[in-house]
């Protein structure tokens, strides 16, 4: 029996309307969705909170980091920091906000980081997982961020200078900050805001519990066609219990939603993704001798447009990798349009060639997975194949079920579902990759 059912969660607004959008282009949401994204004003749950304001920046080099830290400290323990509409607040110094307890931040203006690459590469919070860094870290308990404003990562310079490089290259030393990070935080909610142009991942939750995002719009775009945003995932997590994303739109060049190792109790509802690498479980199993898990995820009412992947499970293979499990995952009501691989189990991650994957297969077990009511069209890049589920010979893949799959390919019909190494009946006709 699945850990999650839709009845366990409050009903949300109906699924988003779908527009035809060019990958990588800026997206202006439809009017009804725009209203969903900027609802901060009615999220006043504590109207009697004391309100703290700080001075705004005079220009893009007027750093108000000290003022922001002062305001956060004053609003802590029951107050609210108000960042006013029509005003800009420039942050040019790293901030340790790990001391928070019962605080609201009402972001109606623009909170913008400087693009001083040399400074940020020397002054940041570092996480060994995939060599991640951040501008700041938020920690503590009962933290609420809401409003109609913008959290701006000012990523263009980062995109320009990182062009041609890869985040997972062992020789990479050009680290780029993550826009929003929680560490050792409990009960964090973010509502209504826009997150714009993160230099790297947009959100990363570390060692945190009960994190929720609702009615958020995430976008990363470049004004330089030869330096597109890279690795600007919408959501990433590490050692997290309780992660909820609802009524949210994501227009980035990498994973739309991608919990990383040891993330459990996941709920996603009404998520719209354009130009992404999909709604992915993982990657996990990257580090030698380390056991990773992702389990108990319920994902429903998702639209995936113009991307590389749709519903994806990904695990590392190779000579020096780890092991673990992806377990108890449900994808339900998933709309696919112009997507290369609508449903995919990738156990040859990251960029592992066929020979190496065969010699050093993944040791991540894949169990209790449901894909239900997945419909739409692939891009045709993989020919007639619309689902590719090939299990590693070094792993157990069992209780994997597909139901109500209505996927087509512009490459022709009938559509093809590939399955190999999976124990039991998957519920639909499938064939081996060598057929």
UniProtKB/Swiss-Prot annotation:
<feature type="glycosylation site" description="N-linked (GlcNAc...) asparagine">
    <location>
        <position position="368"/>
    </location>
</feature>
<dbReference type="Pfam" id="PF00295">
    <property type="entry name" value="Glyco_hydro_28"/>
</dbReference>
<protein>
    <recommendedName>
        <fullName>Probable exopolygalacturonase B</fullName>
        <ecNumber>3.2.1.67</ecNumber>
    </recommendedName>
</protein>
<comment type="similarity">
    <text>Belongs to the glycosyl hydrolase 28 family.</text>
</comment>
<feature type="glycosylation site" description="N-linked (GlcNAc...) asparagine">
    <location>
        <position position="224"/>
    </location>
</feature>
<keyword id="KW-0378">Hydrolase</keyword>
<feature type="glycosylation site" description="N-linked (GlcNAc...) asparagine">
    <location>
        <position position="365"/>
    </location>
</feature>
<feature type="glycosylation site" description="N-linked (GlcNAc...) asparagine">
    <location>
        <position position="328"/>
    </location>
</feature>
<feature type="signal peptide">
    <location>
        <begin position="1"/>
        <end position="15"/>
    </location>
</feature>
<dbReference type="GO" id="GO:0005576">
    <property type="term" value="C:extracellular region"/>
</dbReference>
<dbReference type="InterPro" id="IPR011050">
    <property type="entry name" value="Pectin_lyase_fold/virulence"/>
</dbReference>
<comment type="function">
    <text>Specific in hydrolyzing the terminal glycosidic bond of polygalacturonic acid and oligogalacturonates.</text>
</comment>
<keyword id="KW-0961">Cell wall biogenesis/degradation</keyword>
<feature type="disulfide bond">
    <location>
        <begin position="391"/>
        <end position="397"/>
    </location>
</feature>
<feature type="active site" description="Proton donor">
    <location>
        <position position="254"/>
    </location>
</feature>
<keyword id="KW-1015">Disulfide bond</keyword>
<feature type="disulfide bond">
    <location>
        <begin position="256"/>
        <end position="273"/>
    </location>
</feature>
<keyword id="KW-0326">Glycosidase</keyword>
<dbReference type="InterPro" id="IPR012334">
    <property type="entry name" value="Pectin_lyas_fold"/>
</dbReference>
<keyword id="KW-0964">Secreted</keyword>
<dbReference type="GO" id="GO:0045490">
    <property type="term" value="P:pectin catabolic process"/>
</dbReference>
<feature type="glycosylation site" description="N-linked (GlcNAc...) asparagine">
    <location>
        <position position="184"/>
    </location>
</feature>
<keyword id="KW-0677">Repeat</keyword>
<keyword id="KW-0325">Glycoprotein</keyword>
<dbReference type="GO" id="GO:0004650">
    <property type="term" value="F:polygalacturonase activity"/>
</dbReference>
<feature type="glycosylation site" description="N-linked (GlcNAc...) asparagine">
    <location>
        <position position="262"/>
    </location>
</feature>
<dbReference type="GO" id="GO:0047911">
    <property type="term" value="F:galacturan 1,4-alpha-galacturonidase activity"/>
</dbReference>
<dbReference type="InterPro" id="IPR000743">
    <property type="entry name" value="Glyco_hydro_28"/>
</dbReference>
<keyword id="KW-0732">Signal</keyword>
<feature type="glycosylation site" description="N-linked (GlcNAc...) asparagine">
    <location>
        <position position="301"/>
    </location>
</feature>
<feature type="active site">
    <location>
        <position position="277"/>
    </location>
</feature>
<feature type="glycosylation site" description="N-linked (GlcNAc...) asparagine">
    <location>
        <position position="59"/>
    </location>
</feature>
<dbReference type="GO" id="GO:0071555">
    <property type="term" value="P:cell wall organization"/>
</dbReference>
<feature type="glycosylation site" description="N-linked (GlcNAc...) asparagine">
    <location>
        <position position="274"/>
    </location>
</feature>
């Amino acid at each position: 029996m699945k850990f999650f059912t839709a009845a366990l969660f409050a009903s949300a607004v109906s699924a988003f309307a779908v527009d035809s959008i060019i990958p990588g282009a800026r997206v202006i949401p439809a009017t009804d969705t725009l209203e969903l994204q900027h609802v901060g004003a009615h999220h006043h749950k504590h109207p009697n909170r004391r309100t703290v304001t700080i001075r705004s920046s005079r220009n893009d080099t007027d750093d108000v980091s000290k003022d922001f830290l002062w305001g956060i400290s004053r609003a802590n323990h029951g107050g609210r920091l108000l960042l006013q509409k029509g005003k800009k607040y420039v942050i040019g110094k790293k901030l340790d906000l790990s001391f928070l307890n019962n605080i609201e931040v009402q972001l109606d203006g623009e909170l913008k980081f400087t693009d001083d690459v040399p400074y940020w590469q020397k002054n940041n919070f570092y996480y060994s997982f995939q060599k991640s860094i951040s501008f700041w870290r938020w920690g503590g308990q009962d933290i609420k961020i809401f409003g109609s404003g913008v959290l701006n990562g000012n990523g263009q310079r980062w995109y320009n200078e990182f062009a041609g490089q890869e985040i997972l290259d062992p020789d990479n030393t050009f680290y780029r900050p993550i826009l929003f990070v929680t560490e050792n935080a409990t009960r964090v909610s973010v509502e209504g805001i826009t997150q714009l142009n993160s230099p790297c991942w947009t959100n990363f939750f570390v060692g945190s519990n009960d994190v929720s995002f609702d009615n958020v719009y995430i976008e990363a775009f470049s004004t330089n066609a030869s330096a597109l945003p890279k690795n600007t995932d919408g959501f990433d997590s590490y050692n997290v219990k309780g992660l909820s994303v609802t009524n949210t739109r994501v227009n980035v060049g990498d994973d739309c939603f991608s919990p990383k190792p040891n993330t459990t109790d996941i709920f996603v509802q009404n998520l719209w993704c354009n130009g992404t690498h999909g709604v992915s479980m993982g990657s996990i199993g990257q580090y030698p001798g380390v056991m990773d898990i992702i389990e108990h995820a319920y994902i429903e009412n998702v639209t995936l447009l113009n991307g590389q992947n749709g519903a994806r499970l990904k695990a590392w293979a190779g000579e020096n990798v780890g092991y673990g499990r992806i377990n108890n995952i449900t994808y339900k009501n998933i709309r696919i349009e112009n997507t290369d691989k609508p449903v995919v189990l990738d156990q040859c991650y990251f960029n592992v060639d066929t020979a190496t994957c065969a010699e050093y297969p993944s040791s991540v077990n894949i169990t209790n997975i449901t894909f239900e009511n997945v419909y739409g069209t692939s891009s045709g890049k993989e020919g007639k194949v619309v689902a590719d589920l090939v299990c590693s010979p070094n792993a157990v893949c069992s209780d994997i079920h597909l139901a109500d799959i209505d996927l087509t390919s512009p490459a022709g019909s009938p559509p093809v579902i590939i399955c190999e190494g999976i124990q039991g009946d998957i519920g639909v006709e499938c064939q081996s990759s060598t057929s």
